[in-house]
A protein has these predicted regions:
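Carbohydrate-associated surface elements
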Residues: 123, 143
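A short, charged, and often flexible helix/loop element on the N-terminal side
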Residues: 1-7, 22-29, 88-95
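A short beta-strand/loop micro-motif in the catalytic core of glycosyltransferases
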Residues: 53, 57, 111-122, 138
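Membrane-proximal helix-turn-helix segments that form the acceptor-binding/catalytic region
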Residues: 75-117
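Conserved donor-binding/catalytic core segment of Leloir-type glycosyltransferases
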Residues: 157-179, 185-188
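A conserved nucleotide-sugar
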Residues: 165-167, 182-208
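Charged active-site motifs of nucleotide-sugar-dependent glycosyltransferases
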Residues: 19, 136, 161-168, 196
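Short N-terminal targeting/anchoring amphipathic segment
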Residues: 10-31, 48-57
Length: 209
């Protein structure tokens, strides 16, 4: 998207009929959020039948800069002093407090354009709605296409019910504290054979059933 906005603008505005422009993870070291919003405003003015959809996969939309809060609630009070400069995306100088008001104004501008915010995460949606208004972000859970996920066909037959509660922990990288807290790991370890644990992701800290 960001290689040539002019080219994308021409492609979008020359497309006949309604169009959906769907954003996912936009935050990175080079993202200019104001430029993205200006682009969307320009497109909407030229093509009123376009719809913007933005899927929120983390908390970047509510914080000054962090994608993961890691238990920090400073975003609720203006990100006055960031406790984790190494949190993704890492920085050398903390400017979250200065950037936060303008950043939130950009999200309000997207809402004014009719952007539909969605998230597969309840807690991400709750955080967004607490700032921008109830119902502004809707939940659409991630699904699995069982027709194409051949790994499912290779799974062994289900054993008899153990009677133990089943817990699933799902993340791309299970060793990252932003995805799997050490407090959760300790709590699961303490339960031992009282539960049946299933993990989906790499580098989990617990071995065994």
């Amino acid at each position: 998207m960001f290689g040539n906005l002019d080219k994308l603008y021409r492609t979008v505005t020359r497309t006949n009929g309604p169009l959906v422009l769907h954003f996912h993870v936009l935050h990175s070291y080079w993202l200019n959020l104001e430029e993205v919003v200006s682009f969307c405003q320009k497109v909407k003015a030229h093509k009123p039948d376009i719809t913007f959809v933005w899927t929120l996969h983390d908390h970047w939309s509510v914080t000054g800069r962090c994608a993961f809060t890691d238990g920090c609630e400073g975003w609720k009070t203006g990100c006055l002093q960031c406790p984790t400069l190494s949190n993704y995306p890492p920085v050398k100088i903390d400017k979250a407090h200065q950037q936060l008001p303008g950043k939130r104004q950009m999200f309000r501008a997207m809402l004014a354009l009719g952007c539909q915010f969605i998230s597969p995460s309840q807690h991400v949606a709750d955080a967004f709605n607490s700032l921008y208004g109830a119902g502004r972000c809707r939940i659409i859970n991630n699904g699995i296409d069982v027709a194409t996920e051949t790994i499912l066909a290779e799974l062994p037959a289900m054993p008899e019910e153990s009677g133990r509660p089943k817990i699933a922990v799902v993340a791309h990288d299970l060793r990252y504290d932003g995805k799997t807290s050490q407090q959760l790991v300790r709590a699961i370890t303490a339960l031992g054979d009282k539960i049946e644990l299933h993990t989906f992701g790499k580098f989990f800290a617990i071995c065994g059933r």
